[in-house]
Amino acid sequence: MKKALFIFFVSALYGVCQGSEKVFVENFDRARRFSRHWTTDAVSGSGRIERLPDGGIDDSGCVRITSSERTSLAVKCQLTGLEQGRLYRVSARLKCEDVRDGRGAVLFLDPEGLDQSWNASEFVYGTSDWREVYMDFVPDTLGEATICCGLGFPWGTYNGGKASGTVWWDDVRVEPASDESVYTRESEHIVLKLDRSKVTISDADIDAWLSNLDRVYDAYGDLVGEVPYEGRKILILNTPGIEPGYWALAGNPILWNSHVAVSPLLERTVEFDDWGFGILHEIGHVFSQSNIKNSGRWNWNDEIFANFRMSYALEKCGGTVSQRDVCYRGADIINYYKIFYDETIGAGIAKNNGDALHYTFLRIKERYGWKVFEQAFRMLYALDDTQMPELQNDYDKFLYFLSHVSAAADEDVVRTTYMPEELALIKKSLENRNHL
């Protein structure tokens, strides 16, 4: 008897699983179960999703997703009744044929209700036989999570996310992450969950580092007058699913790339009292106005302001970070940013460089103190976007930001701390950025 073939085109719509089981297993052998528990999702482009009665591991059922063009297609299952705050691991087996571009074949979470949109498994490309991938995740505040087995990713970093080719999915499993594989420590504001194999320092040393991160968290709140995620703890989580070149991705959880030097950074916290520039930077991002308030059109580049928040915290807490094999403690961080100023604006070169602008903000701090920035950020964070004037370009936003610093200083800080030729170079450099 010929086996039935169930084909789901990308425009089809199915019900969402409402099962309350905390450990989920799916081998795609049963068509009725598939139609009850899984829905298809197509974000863009062409392609086809099929549940096949054979073709999986040991010729069992499987899902096949295929597209000759770059696309983002996935089958999705919503899990409910999960324990809030608990770390789970979803794993699946997949094989690929000519998968190219974007995030390739990938497991990920639907971001609805989550504070992190980028969590994913390792990206798989090319042609390969069956192998396992995994992703660790924490459910939303309702104890829910929607797992996605996909070809391509709905949104992209520099690689565009979307992929082409064919992927087969089988043996999807969700279970609590084991203590054997995941190392966990917790402090007042931070929950740290790392690959156990990468933790090479003692619990006491980890606790000392987390205590420093708590102090930084409090300092960020003192600077901007707000805290993210309604005060919920920030999870720092190792993940295999980040593009090469990305150290980490901000959100909750902060995703720390498993493929970068995790162990050496931890060891530097002991050897050099290095608080970790990259981690402080990502925590700085989650204190942005856009993250806390979903507003803040004045902020033309939060890479600058995440680091500027860090400079405040380093000075307030007496913290140390290292860059280019040099350790900077407290207010000495200005010397690091002066390097970039001297290479660009200070040399008369109109090259867009956020670190150079950062140096000019620290010059303002040297003259007026941090209080003017504390007051300026409070004024800015109190505004929603409808209360802001129309800002045409990044230079307008730069001046708008400094107008609030001037209001706090009761003096025009642009006039007192910038030379006209500097402003001309800054304007030109920001115009160059707008045309990139």
Regions found by a protein language model. Give the residues of each.
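Juxtacatalytic substrate-recognition/specificity segment
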Residues: 184-286, 290
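Active-site-proximal alpha-helical
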Residues: 220, 332-425
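Extracellular carbohydrate recognition and processing domains
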Residues: 113-145
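Extra-cytoplasmic beta-strand recognition segments
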Residues: 26-30, 63, 75-103, 133-139, ...
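Zinc-dependent metallopeptidase catalytic helix centered on the HExxH motif
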Residues: 263-329
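Extracellular beta-strand ligand-recognition surfaces/modules
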Residues: 105-107, 132-172
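Extracellular glycan-recognition surfaces and repeat-rich motifs
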Residues: 30-62
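Extracellular carbohydrate-recognition regions
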Residues: 19-43, 173, 180
